[in-house]
Amino acid sequence: MHPDVSADLSELDTTLRTVESVLDVEELRRRIDELEHQAADPELWNDQEHAQQVTSQLSHSQAELRRVEELRTRLDDMPVLYELAEDEGAEAIADADAERHSLREDIAAMEVKTMLSGEYDERDALVNIRSGAGGVDAADWAEMLMRMYIRWAEKHGYGVEVYDTSYAEEAGIKSATFAVKAPYSYGTLSVEMGTHRLVRISPFDNQGRRQTSFAEVEVLPVVETTDHIDVNENDVRVDVYRSSGPGGQSVNTTDSAVRLTHIPTGIVVTCQNEKSQLQNKVSAMRVLQAKLLEVKRKEERAEMDALKGDGGSSWGNQMRSYVLHPYQMVKDLRTEYEVNNPSSVLDGDIDGFLESGIRWRMRENQAS
């Protein structure tokens, strides 16, 4: 085996051992046994929300263990693969090199998962997208972003629940709120917070002029009972109205949509995607609790910044540029990570951006 290959495999082994240590593989196996025991309890589904949490955690833990075990097997097989390849010739060696490069990428992706250790990182994510400057193009852009994140979730087998979609008059959306239901989806998607900028030839401009549009992405952790975010009913004004679809058309004959206004903070939440008013109210309350938790977290961060004499982080402003004309490129303005295939990115292939963002955030946190 070539010395460079041997050194590379040794480096990969060191990285994978670190991943195995951080994940605590033996503890992960113990946790899976515990969750399997809970899942086998016939009374589990008496509480459907808890049952869904247990089955989701079990599925995620099993997948995580399977991934790290597969990586270990592939790495342990590499010396034998190269030994056989050297007997077979250049083409087999090229195949072995390709497997080694693929393995390096997969171990790096697994390593990123170990960087999600924040207080709320393992929670489900609540994503809110709002169109910004750019008129109808901005509304269309907001809908494109919504599709991008939902496609990303679907490709990973994650559940998505859309709580609210406020459609614009001509095309696109004014705003949308949806949950991505998978362990660590908040920690992963939270690096997407900020302003996303699109440059393209406007499909809505008869003269075919170039248009710059903006949309804002907000990502919050889904609130759990342990967060103690209690909402006084007297502080919330409840309004009901009929759900509307694209172009403002009514999609329901009853007043099933719900708008909650939290009077002390002025936070307004709407939900219209459920079939009943009660379901919409429950979903809207979840979103309101998540927003109130974020208010609490911002206050705590402001106190810490004041103690450190720090002006706070501004990374959540304009963070990524998507250029479709006059050239094709998507570039993260914080990490400098870029790709030249916007169509793939807009179809949900954003793992490279997520991984580079998580690594960037870790470096920023260490520096501060």
UniProtKB/Swiss-Prot annotation:
Protein name: Peptide chain release factor 2
SUPFAM superfamilies: Release factor
Signal sequence extent: none
Family of the protein in this entry: Belongs to the prokaryotic/mitochondrial release factor family.
SMART domains linked to this entry: PCRF
Species, as recorded: Rhodococcus opacus (strain B4)
Main subcellular location: cytoplasm
InterPro entries tied to this protein: PCRF, Pep_chain_release_fac_I, Pep_chain_release_fac_I_sf, PrfB
One annotated GO molecular function: translation release factor activity, codon specific
Cell compartment(s), UniProt: Cytoplasm
Disulfide bonds: none
Keywords assigned: Cytoplasm, Methylation, Protein biosynthesis
Alphabetical list of Pfam families matching this protein: PCRF (PF03462), RF-1 (PF00472)
Gene: prfB
